[in-house]
Amino acid sequence: MLEPLNEGLLSRISDVLLCGWTCQHCCQRCYESSCCQSSEDEVEILGPFPAQTPPWLMASRSNDKDGDSVHTASDVPLTPRTNSPDGRRSSSDTSKSTYSLTRRISSLDSRRPSSPLIDIKPVEFGVLSAKKESIQPSVLRRTYTPDDYFRKFEPRLYSLDSNLDDVDSLTDEEIMSKYQLGMLHFSTQYDLLHNHLTVRVIEARDLPPPISHDGSRQDMAHSNPYVKICLLPDQKNSKQTGVKRKTQKPVFEERYTFEIPFLEAQRRTLLLTVVDFDKFSRHCVIGKVAVPLCEVDLVKGGHWWKALIPSSQNEVELGELLLSLNYLPSAGRLNVDIIRAKQLLQTDVSQGSDPFVKIQLVHGLKLVKTKKTSFLRGTIDPFYNESFSFKVPQEELENASLVFTVFGHNMKSSNDFIGRIVIGQYSSGPSESNHWRRMLNTHRTAVEQWHSLRSRAECDRVSPASLEVT
């Protein structure tokens, strides 16, 4: 009889041995079952190329090298698995397991993707051999030289004024004898301290007398010259001398200042245009003088007598008008501000101009309302700053037009027409149409814009509203 203590100890030992054998036997069978065996098709390697060896595979290789248990497929015989009578695995079973693991490792190594190889064959251009036949028969063509192309080029077709192509090569005496338009005396001086250019128009001589309307005789009564000055390419900010009556040898002695940096002034061209003011035929260009300022010493200054050459610009600018438009939808009011005008044409030889602006509201083709500013005496650059308001319901706004006409006040006869623009439904040009569109898109906000005045004939041609007013 064993002691109860000894019986308890033996039972515990037997339980441990039985549990260990059961776990080993069951786990081995589970491992060898099909559910735990991965086929070659189930192996998937993800990641960037080239693929890296998994950590578990590297650990298996290191263990196999330490124990010299790695065999090739030719070293291990393919024998069926048998179990010993006591249920333990035989040596053939161990070899089969080793072979199975080795084959899976070899399969993974063989299927590891490598960097893709692109078989690039050289692209053959041109003829590979002289034996190949040409697709099209060869045609003998004439080889053109650059002279052949430039021989067909005619510069006169691209010149703004074909008659002035040889002016640069002529002296002032030759220009004078060729065109006989007279000569102009002027000077320039740049002030580095105040950054402005001063142009002095002194006098002109030998100007041609105007011809009467029928062309039969010279009309000395209408020889009233004046000079316009600008710095190209900017023709908007121009200056203008006074008109000298009934003379071909006018003396001006007038100075004009242009606020412009020195480097910018060197890139400009001084343009002086001599214009004859005819009371009946209006303003006729006699000739011009163009001086690139990069060719003169601006700081030192200088005086020049230059012969006038013909100008391709037969008509002078009529002037510009600065307007402001504002519409209030809730009140149904169209507000107009006449701010200022500049470089208006002179309408009176002795007094200059007394300009004023007439504003006329046209609904459709019907004149509704007329208003006008006060006239300012003896100026071609008037400042008005006058406001006007027209009652225009919102539903009628799209059919409304505003006609702005600048006149020179004349107490002895009818007022002298200077220029006109139309803004609204029947605008007289793209600038006027753009101003109207901007006002419609920004209600309750004043919209300012400069406009170049147009002739009466031009406005009547493009705007029906211009025909309805006087």
Curated annotation (Swiss-Prot):
Any one biological process term the GO annotation gives: cell differentiation
* Family, as annotated: Belongs to the synaptotagmin family.
Work out whether the entry's keyword set contains Protein transport.
no
Name of a matching Pfam family: C2
**Known CDD domains for this protein?**
C2A_Synaptotagmin-15-17, C2B_Synaptotagmin-17
What species does this protein belong to? Mus musculus (Mouse)
Cytoplasm keyword on record:
no
Question: What is this protein identified as?
Answer: Synaptotagmin-17
Q: Where in the cell is it found?
A: Membrane
Specify the signal sequence span: none
Keywords, sorted A to Z:
Differentiation, Membrane, Phosphoprotein, Repeat
Name a GO CC annotation attached to this entry: membrane
Biological function? Plays a role in dendrite formation by melanocytes.
The residue ranges flagged as biased composition, category Low complexity, are 92-112
